Amino acid sequence: EDGFIRSVGLGKYYIPPISLVFDNAGIYYDPATESELEKIISAGDFSDDDLQLARRLQDRLLKTGVTKYNIGQQSLPKSLLDIKEAGKKIILVPGQVEDDASIAAACEEVKDDFALVKAVKERDSEAIIVYKPHPDVVSGHSPASAHYDSIVAIDDYRVTEVNINDCLA
């Protein structure tokens, strides 16, 4: 499985990953089997040096803007920034490629982005919903949901070329 920091660009362009996840117990996104990563985190047996190293890595990733694919050059729309400044609740809904193994393994009820965005809106109808389709869908390398165009009726904003870090800030 691709690691949490993959590459500069998408795997569909045959750009090799710079990190991979190997786990003999299971994979982190499959709730049916506890992965080695989950066991390590659950045990919480970390030294002060481990925690300090993790904080330094996190700070460096945030400071340098590193993301999984390191793509997205546009800024958030000004109108969305104004909404954020006004204190209105904003929920980011990151899309997924619908034939991805994580969807099949982890989601019993939500099987596509339309169902995901709809469920989020139903849970919090007053929030501003920002939908970010998966980069492979945006690039045309993976098929969009059959209901992809219907998401427009539910989401308030759709951001495609914005860096994920800017969406989370």
Question: What are the functions of these language-model segments?
Answer:
Residues 1-169:
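Catalytic-core helical/loop segments in enzymes performing group transfer/polymerization on anionic/lipid-linked
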